[in-house]
Amino acid sequence: MKKLILSLSVLSLLFVSCSEDNDETVATPKAPVVGEITGDITTNRNLAFGNYTLKGIVKIKSGATVTIEAGSKFTATLSDGTIDALVVENGGKLIINGTAAEPVVFTESSETPGSWGGIIMYGDAPIVAVGGVTTATSEDGLANPYGGTNETHNGGSLKYVRVEYAGKKITDGTSEMNGFSFYSVGSGTVLENLVAYKGADDGFEFYGGTVNLINAISYGNFDDSFDWQDGWKGQLSTNWYAYQTGTGNFGMEIESKNNNNNFWPKVTNITLKRAAGTLTENNSAEYDAIQFKNQGNGDYSNILIEGYTTNANAVAVRIQDVNTNNNQVNASKIKLTNVKINGTTPQFGGTSTVTTVAFPAGQYTTSTTSTGANLTNGAWSTVGGSSLLQ
């Protein structure tokens, strides 16, 4: 009798368990909202997962925070005749909560490089501009002031964001936008897992500031993959991957506006690759992996360079001018360690005015085991079904 009661109890439990399993509901994927962002944003906004049109220069003003859900897509339109860009002004914040599986994508409907202005952020972190001044006017056609003393400026958090077909050239002939432009942005800002894809200018450009860039891909951008000036001095940047294809100049262009600074940025784990047949923008004669000019400096380690050929105008590391050679190379303010070059690209060189480049002991070292950037592939690093990590 006890055995029968026990058996019935077990059967009862099994029935309940099965019933509970069968009663489980499968969550229905939520439909994306459809919307438009335009004009000045002066109050906090939460943009739910959706498809949005980006129209004109959208400015997140001081005191406002815009938060964007994972998987959202923002589309600019070249054909409407407006200049489109997403601008975060000093005091405003942009929080983008993308994920590896659901990145937030900013693109343009015709897929034309240079068709819009990308993401532009301003802060009040320190800069050192031309003549040693600590404030300057932006080069993006918006003529905004930047520079200050707030090393920990916080412009928000950008995680798993892809910007496509940006790098707008402004018709005045001197102004230009990039994929991502960071004007005096501070170390309180989070930049992680960002992609600049097929823009008509630089993928990423820093104008001074102290912000760090962690896990970044610059793919197919016409000018430089990574570029900075005005005394940018981020210390914790790592895992930068550049792939130049079609058109491209330098993997990294490093300058300091002719200021002989006693500080410099630090970047670890760098991959710089160039596809065969890639041309330079405007038929430029040089297309080096890394170029230092106008007193540019820095500390860089675990570097993998590939595809910069034996052409006389291509070297792994170029020292562009006499002042940079004398004040930065010879004074040990440029350090490149654990450099691996796949192929026969010359290691380093100068120009017609810099006939000899000789790094002090320990300031330039090579390694056969350097790995460069260490990135995990996913939807964030995939376009049209193809991985950007070549």
Annotate each language-model stretch with its function.
Residues 1-4:
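Positively charged n-region of N-terminal signal peptides that target proteins for export
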Residues 73:
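Catalytic metal-binding/acid-base residues of hydrolase active sites
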Residues 24-29, 33-48, 54-61, 66, ...:
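Extracellular beta-rich repeat passengers
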Residues 102-103:
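Glycine-rich loop(s) and the adjacent beta-strand/alpha-helix scaffold that form part
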Residues 8-10:
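Hydrophobic alpha-helical targeting segments used for export or membrane insertion
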Residues 19-22:
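Bacterial signal peptide processing site
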Residues 14-17:
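C-terminal motif of bacterial Sec signal peptides marking the signal peptidase cleavage site
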